[in-house]
Structures are given as structure tokens and as C-alpha cells.
Amino acid sequence: MDTRFHCVYLLTSLDPQCAGEYYIGYTVDPIRRLRQHNGEIVSGAWRTKRRGRPWELLCCVSGFGEDRIALKFEWCWQHPTKSTRLKTQMTQLRGVHRLPYAVGVLHLLLRADLFARLQLTLHIFEPERVGRVVAELQGRVPSISPLVATSLLRIEEITKERFMSLYLDGVSGDGTAGDGCVYFVTAPLSSQPDVDAPSRRVRSCRYLSEEDVFRQHARVKELLEANQCPCALCSLPLRSPYFVRCYRTPFCALRAHLACLAMWFTYETMQKRDVTMGQSTRNERSGEYSNKIKDDSNDGTMDAHASGRQLHSLSVNNADFSSSRDAGSILDSSGHISAFEESRCASSPSLTLLPCQPCPCPLCDEPLQWGALVHDLKRRAVLEKRWMERQRREKIEAALAERLQRLQNSSLTERKSRRKATPALGQKRNRGEYCGDTVGDGGKEAVTNWRARAMDGCDSWNDTNDFSHSVSLPPSRDEGYACDSSRRGVGGSKHTTRMTDEGKNDSITDICDCVLQLTEFNLDEWLDA
């Protein structure tokens, strides 16, 4: 389980002789990597060491769940003309070079179908420099619109110090972790914790070392395999991999059924709508009463005592409304449906189980996107299915190889035993001996009769009943084989052996065909749906 911070960064040269030069790379610690490129510490890139120092970190893209996806993003950013996702759009950047070209490719890459479905974050460390480059890009290519924050893409302007404290440092309370250690990853928060926020945020966001993460992952894996890992919402057991999880895993322990989380999304949407409608209704009623009081005071028909009673009635009405609203009552004093509930029922659309808006996580309050959660579920389900089918095929192939080896060993042993039972060439058999066995008196008489009929010109192959019935013990398989071998000589032995091997090969081929028919599978490519 990979728990590191994966990001793809963009560097630009501060050397006036290399103005506009850029470098794109992948790392788990962009601040430490910047020091390596500038030569402060060892293990820098050869390209940045040769020319262009000092380098400046402009931005980086994070939010990749594993290094494979981050490396794919890096390759597409470095080779946009070879990428199948960008090569058809690269005509828009014709005539754009150097740093504006890299920024333009980033704009196109973040809008590609593959990466637009991920919850990514664009960290901008030099907003002024990036703003000038984007303005230059807009002047040359007006068709490329600037990046804006969406439900899946988050854009933040941040300093290197705050970036270190939020994403890379291992500071928890008064304790400090190793300097530059990427295995101490913090749990980033979208905003500062509120004093009135529930304790679930504090309980979910904590600093974990690599050993703790591996230990927790192993424990959860054991529970999932035993069907004992409970759902975070309904406490019923989960079945791997058909469950959804927070994108901040392993820093958030949310693991729930798909239907449970969908109902949570619907519940949160209804709560937000009720709060918004209640606030707007209270504002409207307060405005009506204030306007009425103002009109009465302007006319001069209301004295101080009357105005006091009006204000008192206003406060009482507002208190009654809030209390009835908290109690969940939908009836007014006369027993009819209140105007607020009537307007709510009339304006509220039909609720569906499929969420359409982002919702905060039940444990860490981070915004969750339903499309990203389902995409992650489909990806894990396809990988799990492929892994199980691969294991099944390997087991079948191992069983077939073992059976084939056993058949070969048995055929070799049988050949050796047959060679021992076959009489040598030129060896004389005793009279009355048939294929190594002594023929009885009835057999001798049958042989004599057969020879007499052959001398008379009779067809020996059409009349063999006397011989077949008179022989006391028919020869066995080995004896018959030995007899045929002794009669035909070496050529007959080779022909018989070849026929036997062909029969065995045919049987093994039939077995393989039958078994391989069972291993044929058709993957449900959910990712292409």
C-alpha cells in the first residue's frame, strides 16, 4: 500500500541566459527535489545540473492515489505530441514555445478525460510569475481558457513554508519527525478547524508514520477477507472490493456501502436545503414586520405602547416559528399545513438516490465527489477481478503441468517394463510356447487343425472359432504386445509406440481444451462505461 505524497512539478530557470527554460518531473517531496536540482544536496537531475541553475518551483499537481498514475501524468506532460490524449489538441499550441508551452500543455492535460475524473490539486507557488505566463499564453492562443476551480479540481496559491507544514512535515503537537522524511505525511485540511465543528474532524486527522499505516492496512485487509470490517455508517460487514472510501485514505477511516453513502449524500443535501429555506423564510418575515413598523411610525398613528406590543409580538412569532421548526411540526395553530412547509413541498424537486452535488465526508468533513468515488470503486473492482482470474489461471496451469509430468513419468515407466518383457531378437521359443506362455493340449490341437486347413486352401481368417475357443488362457495386453513385437520386429515396436504416444497426446490435448474453455472470461470494463 503506497501512502506517499505523489506530485508532478514544474521548474523554470532564473538564469537570464536560459530564460524560459523549464523542467517537468515527478517526486514525493518537491521542496527537497528543488534543493537537489539547485545542487544544495546530492542526487540532482543531469539536465538541470548542466545549465539553468538556479531553478524556481512554479507549481505542482498532487492528488494521485499511486505512483503509476502520477508517472503517466508526468509522461503526458513531457511528451504531449506522443500522448494519445493530447496529440489531437496540440495544433492549438502551434507557435508557442518554452515556458508558455509547458503551461498550455498543463491546461490541456488537466481537462483530459483521464485526469478530469480525479480529485487533483494545483499548488501555485509563484502566482505573479504564473499569471504573467498565462496572460502571454492567452495572447497567443485565445482558444485556451484559463483554469478555474471545479468540483474535482482545486487550485490554491500557497507558499513553500505552508506547503511543507500542510503536506510534508511530520510535526504533531510538540514532537517533530525526521527532517524531509516523506513517510510522515500529514492530513491536509481544506480550512482551519472550527471550534464548533464536531470532534470527528480531530479524530480523523492525525499524523501517521509509515509503519503505522502498514499495520493499519494489514489489519483492515484481514478484516475485509474475513468479512468482519464494518461499514462506517450502518455497521454491517463490507465485502471487498465493493465499498467506497474517502479519497484521503489511509488518513480517513471512511469505508461504507455504496447505498449507505448515497443515502448520506441525500440526507446532507436535504439538511442544507432546509437550513437555506428556513433562513430565507425568517429573513422575509423579519423584513415584512420591520417594513410594517416603519410605515406605522411614519404615519404617526402608533404610540410607544403599541409599537412595543408590535415588537413583542414579532419576537414571539419568531420564537414560535423557530420552535415549531426545530420540533419538525408541519401544522400551524389551526391544524392546517403551514405556509413554510407548503412552499417547501412545492419547490422541492423529487429526490433521487444518485447524488448530484458534492457532500462533506462523515468523518473528516472533506468534500467528496460522487463521480470520483464511483470511478475509484470501478477501478478497484476491475483490478480485483483481473487478479482473481490470474490466480485461477495460474492454479489451473500448475495442475495441468503436474498432471502432464505424471503422465510422462508413467509412460516412461511403462516403456521400461515393456522392454523388459519383450524377448530378444533371434531367441528361439520352445515348441508349444505361444508368446512366452505354454499353450495347453487344446491349444496345440487347435494350432494343428489351423495348419491343416491352411494346407487345404481354406481361409484361416474366416474360421478361427476353434482356435479362439480352444485356447485356455488368452494373452494379456503386455503378452499380446510382446507377441506382436516379436513377430513384427523392431519396425512394429516403433509403430506401436508411436500410436500409443499419439493417443496419449490426443487425450492431453482434449483435457487442455476442456479446461481452457472454463478459463475464458469477458471482463466488464467499467472504466470505459
UniProtKB/Swiss-Prot annotation:
Query: Where is the region Disordered?
Result: 275-305, 409-437, 470-501
Residue ranges annotated as coiled coil are none
Where is this protein found?
A: Nucleus
Give the boundaries of each SLX1-type zinc finger.
Answer: 231-364
Annotated GIY-YIG domain ranges read 4-89
Question: Can you supply one Gene Ontology CC term for this chain's record?
Answer: Slx1-Slx4 complex
Q: Where is the composition biased (Basic and acidic residues)?
A: 282-297
Q: Name one GO molecular function term.
A: zinc ion binding
InterPro entries this protein is in?
Answer: GIY-YIG_endonuc, GIY-YIG_endonuc_sf, Slx1, SLX1_endonuclease
Cofactor requirement: a divalent metal cation
What's the main place this protein lives?
A: nucleus
Q: One GO biological process from the UniProt record?
A: DNA repair
Domain of life of the native organism = Eukaryota
Listed PANTHER family:
STRUCTURE-SPECIFIC ENDONUCLEASE SUBUNIT SLX1
Q: Main role?
A: Catalytic subunit of a heterodimeric structure-specific endonuclease that resolves DNA secondary structures generated during DNA repair and recombination. Has endonuclease activity towards branched DNA substrates, introducing single-strand cuts in duplex DNA close to junctions with ss-DNA.
Family note:
Belongs to the SLX1 family.
How does it associate, per the subunit comment? Forms a heterodimer with a member of the SLX4 family.
What protein am I looking at? Answer: Structure-specific endonuclease subunit SLX1 homolog 1
Species name for this entry?
Answer: Trypanosoma cruzi (strain CL Brener)
What taxonomic lineage is listed for the species of origin?
A: Eukaryota, Discoba, Euglenozoa, Kinetoplastea, Metakinetoplastina
